[in-house]
UniProtKB/Swiss-Prot annotation:
Catalyzes the formation of N(4)-acetylcytidine (ac(4)C) at the wobble position of tRNA(Met), by using acetyl-CoA as an acetyl donor and ATP (or GTP). GO terms for biological process: rRNA acetylation involved in maturation of SSU-rRNA; tRNA acetylation; tRNA wobble cytosine modification. Keywords: Acyltransferase, ATP-binding, Cytoplasm, Nucleotide-binding, RNA-binding, Transferase, tRNA processing, tRNA-binding. GO terms for cellular component: cytoplasm. It comes from Idiomarina loihiensis (strain ATCC BAA-735 / DSM 15497 / L2-TR). This is tRNA(Met) cytidine acetyltransferase TmcA. Coiled coil: none annotated. The lineage of its organism: Bacteria, Pseudomonadati, Pseudomonadota, Gammaproteobacteria, Alteromonadales. Residues 319-499 form the N-acetyltransferase domain. Disulfide bonds: none annotated. Its EC number is 2.3.1.193. It is found in: Cytoplasm. Its main location: cytoplasm. Acetyl-CoA binds at I424, A425, V426.
Length: 612
């Protein structure tokens, strides 16, 4: 493929009127995204709609707040010689300073001067057959030769602009005569380039594909696989014959790097034969493109490990991310990225700009051996507190007190100062050495010293994580009966009071811990476990009252209703159905003669009111 000429340029401005003046004179081949301006092409939250497109200029209005995910994603749509122009927030912060600092490093001219022209770039028809580079051709040969190996799976990772989709399209065009092939992606637009190379390809939306019966004779291609929930990708690979899975690894739609680690491990354990390939040579712009270098350094998208930082001091430290030297920040953030599938550049923005967020890390001779992302939450003050309990408000940055105040109807939880362990990560080579537990012990001491009243965490539940947190003193308080669409697991809340065992707070926390444990037993063991619960319980009473008043949904009240009917109304016709943890409103609708789920909920509310 002929390399396009011309380095791409960056423009960062803080003067809104000046930026919009430049924006009005933008190229016809451009896109303008803004949450504030009605004449923009789209709001920032719709940035994913433009992945797979190419523009001479991309204009992003971040005046009301930086959107790092949009910047990272749309940077890859700027063609060679083109321009990325960003209106920075009105008030400078650590992230905007970081953007300007690395702009000064990678662009020789001042990045606050007007951008006057766009270098002309080589254009081509979207349907033109492109000559593959040596790197692409090597992978292409491996892909096409595998047509003789019907159960070989290829995983291809690349940063943006490496010709990944073009390669897949040409491989698909070559192989379609020999196989029945289906293409899927998070959105059809994500597979635009691939489908242009093989216009006869059959595209099916991934959620529709999951509903179809499995067929091992149908070959599957997934483009931008990191944009799908990991469980969905795994199910698709088990239902069909996975041939090609490709994803971008530079941090949008979740973190492609996290996908590459987690999915590749799963694939090698599960699928018959797996080959992993990586594309490194940029094709949409020249090598050493300053805009790509700026993006990589600014948002820490580099995959290369940072082995040591300058300060060789060993120990456990809790600091704001903006206080860390660059190499240390890179180590901490890369560890969080690799350990958590759903990570993104916006995470770095939060760490650098939110004053209540901290990084707790353990280091030995300049190497980070464990890291945790901490968030300060609560208290929630009146009158907002009552609106939260009623489900009318969900104040940003207060996940634990808000969730406990609403889903468990515990008003007092909103009065307290919480420290949430949002994420914790340990390098794979150092796991099972108690580094994470040691870090949690230090976090406990630090929280006590800094006048927090509660520690807590929330995550997608699994038996292993349940065991880990309980070993470290945390108790399960709530397990959602809904399955998360990304993890295919229920969301869980665990908590640990920072008080002695003789206080009223400690006693209430013990009751909530017992409630959560009983709920877990019920979800896994069914009706028989209800005999282990108490005949009368204040938590149950609060939840049933909230359900009667239509404050909380059926899902949040189901366990309380199951207990109540089991103990107080054992002979009621609904008892058997409600004591089954898998019962849904759909089942209740069938019980009432096929009524809608909404009507089934209304009927149940009326029945509870009559019995109460």
């Amino acid at each position: 493929m002929a390399e396009r000429s011309g380095y791409r340029q960056l423009q960062l401005l803080q003067d809104a009127s000046l930026w919009r003046e430049y924006c009005e004179a933008r190229s016809e081949s451009s896109i303008y995204l803004s949450n504030l301006q009605t004449h923009a092409d789209a709001v920032l939250s719709r940035y994913r709609d433009y992945l797979g497109h190419e523009f001479e200029q991309v204009w992003i209005d971040c005046h009301d707040g930086l959107h790092a995910d949009a910047i990272a994603a749309l940077c890859g749509t700027v063609t060679a010689g083109g321009l990325l122009s960003i209106l920075l927030p009105a008030e400078s912060n650590a992230m905007s300073h970081r953007m300007e600092r690395f702009a000064a490093k990678h662009f020789a001219e001042s990045n606050i001067k007007p951008y006057s022209s766009v270098n002309k770039t080589e254009t081509r028809s979207a349907n033109e057959t492109l000559q593959l580079t040596n790197e692409q051709n090597s992978i292409f040969n491996a892909l096409t030769q595998s047509t003789a190996k019907p159960y070989e799976t290829h995983i291809i990772t690349a940063e943006r602009g490496r010709g990944k989709s073009t390669l897949l399209g040409q491989a698909l065009a070559q192989a379609k005569e020999h196989r029945s092939i289906i293409v899927t992606a998070p959105r059809k637009a994500n597979a635009k380039v691939l489908l242009q190379q093989a216009p006869e390809a059959h595209f099916v939306a991934w959620d529709k594909l999951l509903e179809q019966p499995g067929n091992s004779e149908v070959t599957l291609i997934i483009d931008e696989a990191a944009g799908l929930p990991l469980w969905a990708t795994e199910q698709l690979c088990q239902k069909f014959n996975p041939w090609l899975l490709a994803t971008t690894v530079a941090g949008y739609e979740g973190c492609g790097r996290g996908f590459a680690v987690h999915f590749t491990d799963w694939a090698r354990k599960t699928l018959p034969q797996v080959s992993v390939h990586q594309l490194t040579q940029p094709l949409r712009w020249p090598a050493n493109d300053p805009l790509e270098q700026w993006l990589t350094e600014t948002f820490l998208l580099n995959e290369q490990p940072v082995t040591q930082f300058g300060n060789r001091e060993s120990g456990t430290f809790i600091k704001h991310a903006s206080e860390l030297e660059e190499a240390l920040l890179q180590q901490c953030f890369q560890l969080l990225l690799s350990a958590h599938y759903q990570s993104s550049p916006n995470d770095l923005n939060l760490l650098l700009t939110e004053p209540g967020h901290k990084l707790a890390y353990q280091s030995t001779n300049g190497e980070v051996t464990a890291v945790a992302w901490l968030m300060s939450e609560g208290p929630i003050l009146s009158p907002l507190k009552e609106e939260v309990r009623q489900g009318q408000r969900r104040p940003k940055g207060n996940l634990l007190p808000q969730a406990i105040g609403y889903f468990l109807q515990q008003d007092w939880a909103m009065d307290l100062h919480w420290l949430r362990v949002a994420r914790i990560a340990v390098p794979a080579a150092k796991r099972r050495r108690k580094a994470a537990s040691e870090l949690l012990a230090e976090i406990y001491r630090w929280a006590l010293d800094n006048n927090y009243q509660m520690l807590g965490t929330s995550f997608a539940w699994s038996p292993g994580l349940d065991n880990f947190w309980k070993k470290n003193g945390y108790a399960l308080w709530r397990l959602s009966s809904r399955i998360d669409s990304v993890s295919a697991r229920p969301a869980a809340i665990y908590a640990l009071p920072l008080t002695n065992e003789f206080t009223e707070l400690y006693r209430v926390c013990q009751l909530l811990g017992q409630w959560g444990q009983n709920q877990l037993q019920w979800l896994s063991g069914g009706k028989e476990t209800l005999q282990l619960t108490e005949e009368r319980n204040k938590i149950r009473t609060s939840l049933i009252q909230a359900y009667r008043s239509k404050t909380i949904p059926f899902d949040a009240a189901h366990f309380a209703l199951a207990q109540w009917f089991y103990w107080q109304h054992s002979n009621h016709p609904l008892t058997e159905l409600l004591c089954n943890s898998s019962t849904t409103l759909k089942h209740l609708g069938e019980y009432w003669g096929g009524v809608s789920q909404r009507q089934a909920n209304e009927n149940l509310c009326k029945e509870v009111c009559l019995l109460h």
